């Protein structure tokens, strides 16, 4: 120590300690400020995100309330004041339905054309009726012909044959067609021209449409006609704005909170992202896009009431002649609602006479449900009461309207896909 020369004396140690203390204090102040900003950011995201979640949930509840029928109609026995295609759309607003809306709309519209005598539908391929004028044929005679020939009985389950009747070609204005029915008939007439005959089955339709480059335009024409027809009812209004915007903002705040904190605090990041994502997913899954207007409440009441009445048809003891007269239209709207198979069973429970082929040939040959029940004579089913679910609800066509609903739906889906595939790539397909 004696060998070290002291150059200058002073309080350098105290100064160094003071400097280090100041630096430490600045660091602590910076950390405190950073923590305060982080907490403030959490609070801002939490408050704004929570507010958006509350607004989104309120919007979802409100949209669901507006999409609910609040009137007093429990059962409705007459045709609704809307076309079958519009009924297929409207029932989706207020109730759960089986099958795609576009498919149900097409099927119900075709059946409406059958009721209005613009079309006729027969089981089996068109070749099975070669030499027969189906525009004048009696359904009972055709049923007896099929029953007497096992090969025809077998072929009857393979497809359906459509017949464009003469009045649809020459006196269409007398049929009282709606916009959607007119567009559907025009589509079928165009297809029949490509087939080369007013009598054609789905296999022929598919083959004829496989190279129809402009076919998507006719399909779009039908889809647009359905949309315009429904818009003109003024039955619904858009209520999605009540929940879509706050739902998106809530999810955005959740993502921001997660990204900001994922590197420093995984628990907080998951709380933000997970909670807001769950709320957003819930709102996206349960929010309704369309709510009923005042007139929409009336139309919805009629559709829901008719659906309930048809589903409970066999429970009513006061059925009368009106129900039999209306049954053709019941089957049309059953297809629009996606309940054809159930309604066919209900009618069979209420009127066991349909199990008797002779009774059907005498009194039911001109009804839309004739082939539903008559086909069981050649399919080995003598009664309806013990029918399996597959007989009405399966994909196989057995000559019945209950099954023809599925068959027409499947057939037109296939034809639509064929038309879309034939469309030029720039057209974007049929959309229908």
Regions found by a protein language model. Name each.
Residues 1-432:
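Acidic, Ser/Thr/Pro-rich intrinsically disordered cytosolic tails and loops
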């Amino acid at each position: 120590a004696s060998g070290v020369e002291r150059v200058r004396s002073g309080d350098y140690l105290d100064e160094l300690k003071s400097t280090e203390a100041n630096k430490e204090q600045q660091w602590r102040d910076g950390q405190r400020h950073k923590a305060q900003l982080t907490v403030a950011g959490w609070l801002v995201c939490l408050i704004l995100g929570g507010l958006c979640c509350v607004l989104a949930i309120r919007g979802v509840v409100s949209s669901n309330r507006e999409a609910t029928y609040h009137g007093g109609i429990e059962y409705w026995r007459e045709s609704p004041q809307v076309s079958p295609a519009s009924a297929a759309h409207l029932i989706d607003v207020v109730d759960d339905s089986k099958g795609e809306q576009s498919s149900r709309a097409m099927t119900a519209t075709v059946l409406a054309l059958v009721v209005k005598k613009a079309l006729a539908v027969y089981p089996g391929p068109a070749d099975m009726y070669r030499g027969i004028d189906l525009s004048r044929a009696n359904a009972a005679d055709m049923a007896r012909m099929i029953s007497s020939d096992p090969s025809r009985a077998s072929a009857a389950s393979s497809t359906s044959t459509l017949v464009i009747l003469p009045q649809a070609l020459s006196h269409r204005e007398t049929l009282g067609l709606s916009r959607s029915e007119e567009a559907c008939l025009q589509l079928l007439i165009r297809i029949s021209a490509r087939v080369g005959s007013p009598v054609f089955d789905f296999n022929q339709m598919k083959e004829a449409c496989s190279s129809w480059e402009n076919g998507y335009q006719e399909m779009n024409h039908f889809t647009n006609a359905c949309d315009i027809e429904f818009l003109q009812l003024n039955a619904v209004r858009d209520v999605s704005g009540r929940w879509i915007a706050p739902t998106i903002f809530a999810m955005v705040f959740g993502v921001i909170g997660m990204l900001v904190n994922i590197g420093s605090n995984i628990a907080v990041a998951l709380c933000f992202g997970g909670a807001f994502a769950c709320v957003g997913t819930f709102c996206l899954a349960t929010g309704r896009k369309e709510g009923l207007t005042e007139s929409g409440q009336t139309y919805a009441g009629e559709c829901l009431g008719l659906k309930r009445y048809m589903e409970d048809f066999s429970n009513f003891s006061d059925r009368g002649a009106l129900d039999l007269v209306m049954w053709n239209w019941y089957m049309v709207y059953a297809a629009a609602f996606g309940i054809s198979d159930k309604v066919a069973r209900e009618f069979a429970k209420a009127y066991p006479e349909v199990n008797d082929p002779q009774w059907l040939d005498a009194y039911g040959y001109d009804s839309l449900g004739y082939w539903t029940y008559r086909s069981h004579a050649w399919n080995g089913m003598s009664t309806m009461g013990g029918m399996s679910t597959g007989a009405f609800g399966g994909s196989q066509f057995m000559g019945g309207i209950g099954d023809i609903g599925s068959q027409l739906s499947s057939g037109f889906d296939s034809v639509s896909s064929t038309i879309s595939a034939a469309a030029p790539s720039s057209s974007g397909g049929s959309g229908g």
